[in-house]
């Protein structure tokens, strides 16, 4: 028993030392001063040290219809509660979740006390433009994100605060954009207008050029017949799927040097300039489901190319890659060419031009009489890269695989991790 006493002493000293460190950290790091008898902090730490998240005193409150979690003291969750009106919002709330309700109006009093709001999610409700009081959002000088998608809006919700960075208006009935709608929105980086009723006349006058920091623009599933004019130089991701665009001006992309990804599938493109996509930063290009009859020049940094469901009868590799540069390889890794009118596989010369290519998806092809045929090659061809070959030199370089679903690559919202990190 005597030998255990020193252990008890050491353990007691260790506990005192650790506790003292925690106390020093709490005051030194959080308050940066010695506590006084009459000092009362605005918030205190939750008893569960694992979370380390502050929670506000009960006096700040929470709407009775909603839930305000202790670990996220500035968030209020009122989603999916069959609400017909916006509840009272405490002053300290910064993130407000009201999606999936039956809210029909946003009145001048809806956010009268909530001056610190940074994000409002009103998606999946029944809001109409006429039921949004003028200037109700513009008064929120800290607002950064506004979700109004999946409602019944007929007009753009103008005016909006200068602080706004992300604006989601998809799945509405918007058909007009006033010339002053984008005034003051100098910090918007992401604008989603997919699934509306926008036409060429709606975007005339280069209305979108006012968004000087815009990086992502979604205009899919509208009524556009030509490329949207006056897009800002800052744009990196452009979605134009499911419109009726039939041509692209030859110098159109010269004004978009930072473009990383372009999705213009399900349109009516037939003849496009040979080097129209000669963009040094372009990584993903989807021109599937058009009426293209031949391939085009492939920029050096392009990695994913989708040509499915066009009218292509043969692919001339020298058009895609007119010259070889052993010091600067092309980066193309994935090519999809199913549902075209190919009669034979692509020439093996493609692997000299694009040495990094991993996969070519041929799928089924369409014959002149409308029947589907399969080429005398694997439906899905994969090619090992150098690292895989080093691991297993004996493994066959081709194998069959399943078709990568179009939905995975063709979502109108950009879901690539790199995009999310950028925006």
Swiss-Prot record:
Keyword Secreted: yes
Tissue expression as described in the entry: Osteoblast and odontoblast. Expressed in femoral bone and calvaria tissues. Detected in femoral head, rib, tendon and bone marrow.
LRR repeats: 92-113, 116-129, 142-164, 165-184, 187-207, 213-233, 234-255, 258-279, 281-294, 301-322, 331-353
Cystine connections: 321-353
Sugar-modified residues: 113, 121, 187, 242, 278, 316
Subcellular location: Secreted, Extracellular space, Extracellular matrix
BP terms from Gene Ontology: cell adhesion; regulation of bone mineralization
Modification after translation: Glycosylated; contains keratan sulfate.
LRRNT domain residues: 53-91
Protein name: Osteomodulin
Organism: Rattus norvegicus
